[in-house]
């Protein structure tokens, strides 16, 4: 669930209701600023993933630039890094970002798969984008960092990402909800899980 600064999708009351009534782990996406970090710390979900935000965007458009904003991030993230919440940061597949995340003391990254998904849709540079992800998940794993991935993943394009053994979690929301309008949520989740399981075995 993504509680945006502008509360465009859901707000903190929705988040509290979800945490109270859903008996599965919740992954909270928030911006890396003091207000949102306080919400994350108070609500205490199992996972918090820090993402960049732009008020004009329709959806998250890229990864957080940890290397460029390292000094500021190390300061604002300090309180939540001292909790028991599992922290990850949403980044583009880039070794400098991975190095910065390791220096920050964060043990998990979520790789932005949007460029791969766009390439897949256009049938252009798919191998190039996949190679970039593959090289970076291997680099992250070698540096002791857990690898998650997500953004733009669908029934058609998820297999190649799920087949990467270093990736231990995929975060897929928008597509499953969109598909569930026509096919039912349980059916959409089951179909996606079957594709992922088949690709990762």
Where are these regions (language model features)?
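Hydrophobic faces of well-ordered beta-strands that scaffold small-molecule active sites
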Residues: 1, 26-30, 48-50, 87-89, ...
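Alpha-helix-loop-beta-strand connector modules within alpha/beta enzyme cores
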Residues: 7-34, 68-88, 126-149, 192-196, ...
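C-terminal helical cap(s) of enzyme catalytic domains, especially alpha/beta-barrels
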Residues: 19, 62, 121-126, 178-201
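Glycine-enriched alpha-helix->loop->beta-strand junction motifs that scaffold or abut catalytic
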Residues: 21-24, 42-48, 82, 102-109, ...
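Catalytic cores of alpha/beta
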Residues: 34-43, 93-104, 149, 153-167
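Hydrophobic, well-structured mid-protein blocks that either form specific transmembrane helices
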Residues: 48-107
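Glycine-rich phosphate-binding active-site loops on the catalytic face of alpha/beta enzymes
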Residues: 49-57, 108-120, 166-185
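Histidine/lysine/aspartate-rich catalytic loop segments that bind and position anionic ligands
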Residues: 86-139
